[in-house]
């Protein structure tokens, strides 16, 4: 019985991450799946979507939740479609960065309460999914075992951080922005489900603080994750799991992407102490409800020519449109009542740039500059940004 359980766990783990990464295609598949798992863990643990919007998969001793399409939760279905658009840009090596942001006013998606930054780098051999690490000198010698180990560590970091952050407001919405390597991206390119967006920055509703989560390298890709959240949500986080490089963090000037220069001024998230405490209190590393039977299609199944276990019908369901307005309520992991909403993007109230600037001056809120360059010429040149056709 124990042997069968071990085989089952190993088999399900292999469905998430391949055991071997020796080609660019295998690396691309791995990065896509790691992105899917990361987004799923974040949205699950932050209580963004109700329980039914997730399936279950296993990574060694970790039980993780994977976002899936749910007709009763249009918001999760919409995020699945966004992810498919991200995969398209990633496969073409255009994608530079994803900003997944949480906001509270459905009519003002530019004023955010929390955001997650996923940054991608591509080596000469292919792309890399990078979660911020000091060890960036041995990418060419990265083994499959090293990559898998780093991936599981990253997921554990996400798990610990998300569980210890203060709760989000009860009713929240999601938006996403995509940034590109403009020098190689065609000027008219837009991923499926996206349109031309605003590159002027977003307004942070509160006092932001910035966390480096980690990095996962492969021989072909690098993926990096950072989290920006309200300072007050950090109050319950034990200082022992934060390793600040500079105790005087300039909260009033948070830059979303200035390569690695700003990393020296941000907190690194260290989970060793917290994980040891949790392991002492519990003999399991399960995120939640490991006994759920998940037979539905998951967002990780993003390739059209996947294995025979994935039917064409499932793929079509993943990319099918969900256009109606629907509201559903469910108790989330934090005990809040969550309303899952999806509103057609054309029905969203639009706030003019002049009104936004005026409101910003009056409220004293912080502007998060998405991109900043030391080159004046680069600043004058408008960077291309994509945003979803429809918001959740």
UniProtKB/Swiss-Prot annotation:
Annotated region (Disordered), positions in chain: 271-292, 371-392
Protein's name according to its UniProt entry: HORMA domain-containing protein 1
GO biological process, one term: meiotic sister chromatid cohesion
Pfam family, one: HORMA
Disulfide bridge positions per record: none
Phosphoserine PTM positions: 374
Domain of life: Eukaryota
Subunit organization: Interacts with HORMAD2. Interacts with IHO1.
Keywords of this entry: Chromosome, Differentiation, Meiosis, Nucleus, Oogenesis, Phosphoprotein, Spermatogenesis
Origin species: Rattus norvegicus
